[in-house]
Amino acid sequence: MTPSPLIRRFSPNRLGRDLAVGDIHGYFALLQQALDSIDFNPERDRLFSVGDLTDRGPECAKALDWLARPWFHPVCGNHDDYVCRHESCDRENWIQNGGGWFAQLSQSEQALFAARYRALPLAIEVQTRRGPVGLLHADCPFPTWQGLLDQLDAGVSGGRLRAIKNVCLWSRRRIELLDESGIEDLVALVVGHTPVSVPVHLGNIYYIDTGGWYPHAGGYFTLLDLDSLTPLFPER
């Protein structure tokens, strides 16, 4: 079976730290400040993102520069999926949710963003000292991580793939129900999508979108160490 491009797998980082960050939404300068404050070393460390690179913030155009950095590895978020589907999505709804920056790009620039975003994986799996850690934007549609990987590696398509993506990109059901059942066969699943005032976990699912994209209202970027599952709080 050929591995699906919707999954990206990473071996353990033997040189430095593996960190995960919540939704970015075009606030790359503040993200860089957060990384600097915890002495992030791009020669040794890796940064994984739960997606939503753009919309809402002032620096959305910088996303392509960040995607070119060999140590930066995001999954696709629901806002990133707007870019992937820019020719067919509900443009009015997108603009209401921060997508106006994309409408101001030239057609060639839009095509470049769309091509790069379509290459983003839906899921990332990182091997750590304690075992595998998964990353999705919102939630896992199966009780086991392997269940998701098997479906994606099998090349599921059409309505079935759309249903899987809908949960991975949009679902808030678990956190709304305070469901602590977790995901089997993972040390942890790290997600964003739902803003929280501090990092929280339900079972082994870690919610780390602490609102780095609304600093005016007290939000900040949390950086989660994937080996220890310890949140690092950059200086604010």
Question: Which residues make up each language-model segment?
Answer:
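N-terminal active-site segment of His-dependent metallophosphoesterases
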Residues: 1-63
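Beta-strand-turn-beta hairpins that frame and shape the catalytic cleft
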Residues: 12-19, 125-134, 202
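Active-site-proximal beta-strand elements of phosphoester/diester hydrolases
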Residues: 18-25, 133-139, 207-208
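Residue-level marker for buried hydrophobic side chains located in beta-strands
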Residues: 20, 47-49, 74-75, 134, ...
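Divalent metal-coordination and catalytic microenvironments
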Residues: 23, 52, 67, 77-78, ...
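Active-site environment of divalent metal-dependent phosphoester hydrolases
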Residues: 25-29, 55-58, 80-84, 141-143, ...
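Active-site neighborhood of divalent metal-dependent phosphoester bond hydrolases
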Residues: 60-134, 141, 155-171
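Conserved beta-sheet core of the metallophosphoesterase superfamily
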Residues: 171-234
